[in-house]
């Protein structure tokens, strides 16, 4: 159930409309989606159609903006998520952090798994967007930077992971250890 109200006198001059409003973090309302009936434009453009009786009639035009202004939608979305996009729409979904060069062959196995993943609809045919951070920096610095970039999934790979055939996973609000054999299924289930 959606909360709604009638705003008499606020409708556009060309006919009634429905606005879908979203509230930002400061309590301000923003119009996002809208749908409206337009009785004016068809007349201005001289639009007609022939009805089932063979008579000319004036159509009613329907305007709609599914998201409203894309800029307005994105600003409300970014603010609402505080920049922590859901996994499926994050520009960079995964950052792989290496502890040292000794894990390179193991990272190649992880990359092969990521390249093989087929995401479910609506994401089918989307490749996993990831990057490997091989820089000779401290792990703490790499984690801080990836977190600051709000990357939803951080995979940490060190010698202990290679030995145990696991991957250390950091999500926005949790940490986990995943067997390499289970990594593809784990990634597919991220939201």
Residue ranges of predicted features:
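NTP/phosphate- and nucleic-acid-binding module
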Residues: 1-191
């Amino acid at each position: 159930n959606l909360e709604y109200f009638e705003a008499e006198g606020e409708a556009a001059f060309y006919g009634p409309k429905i606005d879908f409003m979203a509230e930002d973090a400061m309590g301000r309302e923003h119009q996002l989606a809208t749908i409206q009936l337009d009785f004016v434009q068809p007349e201005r453009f001289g639009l007609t159609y022939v009805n089932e009786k063979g008579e000319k009639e004036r159509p009613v035009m329907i305007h709609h903006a599914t998201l409203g202004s894309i800029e307005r939608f994105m600003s409300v979305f970014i603010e609402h998520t505080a920049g922590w996009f859901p996994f499926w729409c994050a520009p960079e979904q995964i950052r792989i952090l290496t502890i040292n060069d000794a894990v390179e062959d193991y990272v190649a196995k992880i990359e092969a798994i990521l390249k093989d993943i087929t995401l479910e609809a609506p994401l089918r045919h989307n490749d996993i967007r990831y990057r490997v951070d091989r820089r000779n920096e401290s792990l703490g610095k790499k984690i801080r930077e990836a977190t600051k970039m709000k990357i939803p999934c951080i995979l940490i790979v060190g010698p202990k992971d290679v030995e145990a055939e696991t991957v250390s996973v950091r999500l926005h609000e949790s940490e986990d250890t995943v067997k390499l054999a289970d990594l593809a299924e784990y990634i597919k289930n991220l939201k």
